[in-house]
Amino acid sequence: MQENTRLRIAIQKSGRLSKESMKLLSECGVKMHIHEQSLIAFSTNLPIDILRVRDDDIPGLIFDGVVDLGIIGENVLEENELKRQSLGENPNYKLLKKLDFGFCRLSLALPQENKFQNLKDFEGLRIATSYPQLLKRFMKENGINYKNCMLTGSIEVAPRANLADAICDLVSSGATLQANNLKEIKVIYESRACLIQKENALIKEKQALVDKIMLRVAGVMQARESKYIMLHAPKEKLDKIQALLPGVERPTILPLAHDEKNVALHMVSKENLFWETMEALKEEGASSILVLPIEKMLK
């Protein structure tokens, strides 16, 4: 049977990575119409199908070669990889790129009233988690015996409901822990979204499309962390002013009409400019300072 030449990309249907995944694809020029209840969306300008599934299903779809690409949190990817390995399987995939969203951490937490001295305080405790494999690996590496309490949601209420003594759950800001009278003790895994590809080689048409998408993803991410700077600067202060601006490439220096002492400086800065930097530029004699966002960028 001839392989379908349309590229299949799996993303989270709903949840913390869903909107950012769709935004990334859109910024990469993938046009599509999404219906809320639909599990699949077809790109209208590229041979791409978007599968909207549960995040826990994405690693398996990649491991089994059902889809070509997937956007998934590293925590879910690693948990599923460890689970497959525990069953004697050897899951394979290609990590194409770590993305700039979905940042979180998997942490051990205890009730606020519990005194904590070191990790051995978790010895023999019952720990509620949705990530048993990551927890098991960490505890084994640290020589700690514990009892596992597998839950799929509302992990933070487990101690209060007397289901567990402690929890191991995802933390972003820590507000949920605080609201449930818990304190974060130890980060056991740091995670972000990533773009992965199935291990088996793609046909020529699909690989060419993946290469195009990867170029665009890199451009989008670089644009997000860069700013276009325009300012007027005294000629004698150019070196000091340029030193304050970490640029992707050398700046463009342009003469100003009827002004022999100053020039216009245009450049792409690889870092976000804070007020302190702009104030430092001002102190060095820069004026008319403009900091503009960059929508797309290719080096």
Curated annotation (Swiss-Prot):
GO BP field: L-histidine biosynthetic process
Pfam short name (any one): HisG_C
Gene3D superfamilies: 3.30.70.120, Periplasmic binding protein-like II
Keyword Cytoplasm: yes
Pathway assigned in UniProt: Amino-acid biosynthesis; L-histidine biosynthesis; L-histidine from 5-phospho-alpha-D-ribose 1-diphosphate: step 1/9
A cellular component annotation (GO) from this entry: cytoplasm
Cofactor(s) the protein needs: Mg(2+)
Documented activity regulation: Feedback inhibited by histidine.
Location in the cell: Cytoplasm
Catalytic activity: 1-(5-phospho-beta-D-ribosyl)-ATP + diphosphate = 5-phospho-alpha-D-ribose 1-diphosphate + ATP
Known EC number: 2.4.2.17
Chain ranges passing through the membrane: none
Keywords, in A-Z order: Amino-acid biosynthesis, ATP-binding, Cytoplasm, Glycosyltransferase, Histidine biosynthesis, Magnesium, Metal-binding, Nucleotide-binding, Transferase
Record-stated family: Belongs to the ATP phosphoribosyltransferase family. Long subfamily.
This protein's name: ATP phosphoribosyltransferase
Organism: Campylobacter jejuni subsp. doylei (strain ATCC BAA-1458 / RM4099 / 269.97)
